[in-house]
Amino acid sequence: MVASDEILKRTSDQYRRIRNTFRFILGNLNDFNSNDRINHENQVELDKWIIDEVINLEKKVINSYETYSYHKAVQSIHNFCVNELGGIYLDIVKDRLYTCKNNSIARRSCQTSLDILLNKLIKLISPILSYTSEEIWQLCPSLLEQEDSVFLSNFSDNNEKISMKIDSGEWKRIFEIK
């Protein structure tokens, strides 16, 4: 195995990006609990889109784990955090999170999506970032309500309930304009 300062720096940067994504999500769920969830049908379209994207990511990462392609799993998670979350979704929803009333439908819709993202992403990183995922799990009361540890939780669940067919081609055209 080859190791160099460049590889270690790149790995550190990937870890930092993933960790900071979780920090942002956790910071915006501090006043949110499961009673505040919005039904998927009533969510803002952008929030539906990101849920659909994380479900697609989940399938891809699980397939990578099943074929022992851990590098592909890491790359997929990192690219999702950088491109879909950092590059699009989180940048757009900041205004809603910071300016809307605490109990507004728009803010709760976003927080519902962030809660789903947290739940899915933490399970996806657990095989590769075990200490980080467990630390996040222990800090989040809504996750502790499910199980005592991320490693005792079901890896994939509830996709049938929340997955709706989203026209991803339409969203790609919108993001190209951006």
Task: Write out the residue ranges for each language-model feature.
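Catalytic adenosine-cofactor/nucleotide-binding cores of aminoacyl-tRNA synthetases and other
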Residues: M1-E41, S142-V150
